């Protein structure tokens, strides 16, 4: 999965997919009542990027729905996965459940169109704080209450705080999550970061009793870093330059080992050689 980083304006969806992304990451900011409000990152952000592009969250969802609904004039067949980077750190811990409930309602209405031919992309809820695990339970409960528990088949999870892998496992246990787990590791492109924790996550993914299904590394803009991440065995690379990642994937060392994921590739299944 080539994951376009910080796609917060509708116009950027086409821009990143046309450069080779089959997945995008979108920032979600919340108001003080835990309503998802804007697709917005803010300052500071990655070096070389504009930090302030934004849409109202529900408006962005409507644009995203068009981009991921077959038959729509804006349809982008290659776009199969969306990571919502939930900026829940602005909330109190006891608001996490509410944030999850409100997020579920927004998606149900504006993206899934209440189960009536909505967008088809798989969704990852990426949460920065292990203490906010109730965001997941609130989300799940709401889809159930609203009569669409089947949509949870399209939803996965990530804790993005670079926490100790054992602590991440405990948070999922509390949230009642088994499966659909993506594990991120990374840092802003302005700073270097080693691959030690990525390798730990990959080892968990590949062990018989691991809880991780997929591992992605962020934010990767250089060819050398891309090669390092691929050599470590990641499933996804988040980038500001999808064309750079696509280029490296076409190198002889990688093109026999990796291919770009399509809609037919289940993002919740651990890849077995």
From Swiss-Prot:
Stored SUPFAM superfamilies: PLC-like phosphodiesterases
InterPro entries linked: PLC-like_Pdiesterase_TIM-brl
Stated name of the protein: Dermonecrotic toxin LdSicTox-alphaIB3aii
Major location category of this protein: secreted
Function field: Dermonecrotic toxins cleave the phosphodiester linkage between the phosphate and headgroup of certain phospholipids (sphingolipid and lysolipid substrates), forming an alcohol (often choline) and a cyclic phosphate. This toxin acts on sphingomyelin (SM). It may also act on ceramide phosphoethanolamine (CPE), lysophosphatidylcholine (LPC) and lysophosphatidylethanolamine (LPE), but not on lysophosphatidylserine (LPS), and lysophosphatidylglycerol (LPG). It acts by transphosphatidylation, releasing exclusively cyclic phosphate products as second products.
Disulphides: 45-51, 47-190
Active site annotation, chain numbering: 5, 41 (nucleophile)
Cofactor binding summary note: Binds 1 Mg(2+) ion per subunit.
């Amino acid at each position: 999965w080539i994951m376009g980083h910080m796609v917060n304006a509708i116009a950027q969806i086409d821009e990143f997919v046309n450069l080779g992304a089959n997945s995008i990451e979108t920032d979600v900011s919340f108001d003080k009542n835990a309503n998802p409000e804007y697709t917005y990152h803010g300052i500071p952000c990655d070096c070389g990027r504009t930090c302030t592009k934004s849409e109202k969250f529900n408006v962005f969802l409507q644009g995203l729905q068009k981009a991921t609904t077959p038959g729509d004039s804006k349809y982008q067949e290659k776009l199969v996965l969306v990571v919502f980077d939930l900026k829940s750190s602005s909330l109190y811990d006891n608001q996490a459940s509410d944030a999850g409930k409100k997020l579920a309602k927004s998606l149900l209405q504006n993206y899934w169109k209440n189960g009536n031919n909505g967008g088809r992309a798989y969704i990852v809820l990426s949460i920065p704080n292990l203490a906010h695990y109730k965001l997941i339970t609130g989300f799940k409960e709401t889809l159930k209450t609203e009569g669409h528990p089947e949509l949870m088949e399209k939803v996965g999870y990530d804790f993005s705080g670079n926490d100790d892998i054992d602590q991440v496992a405990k948070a999922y246990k509390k949230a009642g999550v088994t499966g659909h787990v993506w594990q991120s590791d990374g840092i802003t492109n302005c700073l270097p970061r080693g691959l030690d924790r990525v390798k730990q996550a990959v080892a968990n993914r590949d062990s018989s009793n691991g809880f991780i299904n997929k591992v992605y590394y962020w934010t990767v803009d250089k060819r050398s870093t891309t090669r390092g991440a691929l050599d470590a065995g990641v499933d996804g690379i988040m980038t500001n330059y999808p064309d750079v990642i696509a280029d490296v994937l076409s190198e002889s060392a990688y093109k026999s080992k990796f291919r770009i994921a399509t809609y037919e590739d289940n993002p919740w299944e651990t890849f077995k050689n």
